[in-house]
Amino acid sequence: MHSLATAAPVPAALAQVDREKIYQWINELSSPDTRENALLELSKKRESVPDLAPMLWHSFGTIAALLQEIVNIYPSINPPTLTAHQSNRVCNALALLQCVASHPETRSAFLAAHIPLFLYPFLHTVSKTRPFEYLRLTSLGVIGALVKTDEQEVINFLLTTEIIPLCLRIMESGSELSKTVATFILQKILLDDTGLAYICQTYERFSHVAMILGKMVLQLSKEPSARLLKHVVRCYLRLSDNPRAREALRQCLPDQLKDTTFAQVLKDDTTTKRWLAQLVKNLQEGQVTDPRGIPLPPQ
């Protein structure tokens, strides 16, 4: 373990005086009296300090302090009494953990320490109040930052946890923003070959995913969101790469994806339109047509 002063080379863009402030705030995380302000300042600066993640990870007591912030609000989850102030404070701690999760030098250690599991109680919450919604969204952001790296070790880790059912529940009943991030996480898991195989391994897993995606399509036909629809279509398209899932989707793909329901929403989105066309094509291929022009399922 090295001292903060030698944690990393100084980026040219960051003035020395700012570096000193960063070191000071990191040291202040260790003390409960100075932690709240340090969390706020560091979370504001995290985008402009490229090596903040290694500094947080390797400095004495810092990760323990961030985990303490998380554990401290567990009692406010059930019964749900979380205040806006509590939510803002813990979300600043989560923002710093997201920084650690997405940095190539600290990601593996972050996973090896099973730190994402500390966030799962927040994803289990169902209260619709703003403090809880913000808490769920920020927690999803940490997992989203992990999957965005497209690293095999991330998917392997997540598949050993309950992240898929947690995401599916949020996809069904969260706010539009939370649904979007949760669907993005599922999409990233599906795009990995191991993730696709895992979800299609049993009928129960596949049917749970297909059921939630189907409900989302129905909801989107009433309250359209191009961004959310894009992720839903990509999930369906990826599922159609698996032969067994493709067979099942021929029966259960929502009609709204086969007719003109979303034509207006997607009129300027060439990527999603292409994915949708490919999905329909994938489901048609391999079907035998009888003389009356009716597609027959393969024998």
From Swiss-Prot:
GO terms for cellular component: CCR4-NOT complex; CCR4-NOT core complex; nucleus; P-body. Keywords: Activator, Cytoplasm, Nucleus, Repressor, RNA-mediated gene silencing, Transcription, Transcription regulation, Translation regulation. GO terms for biological process: mRNA catabolic process; negative regulation of intracellular estrogen receptor signaling pathway; negative regulation of translation; regulatory ncRNA-mediated gene silencing. Its main location: nucleus. Belongs to the CNOT9 family. Component of the CCR4-NOT complex which is one of the major cellular mRNA deadenylases and is linked to various cellular processes including bulk mRNA degradation, miRNA-mediated repression, translational repression during translational initiation and general transcription regulation. Additional complex functions may be a consequence of its influence on mRNA expression. Involved in down-regulation of MYB- and JUN-dependent transcription. Enhances ligand-dependent transcriptional activity of nuclear hormone receptors. May play a role in cell differentiation. Homodimer. Component of the CCR4-NOT complex. This is CCR4-NOT transcription complex subunit 9. It comes from Xenopus laevis (African clawed frog).
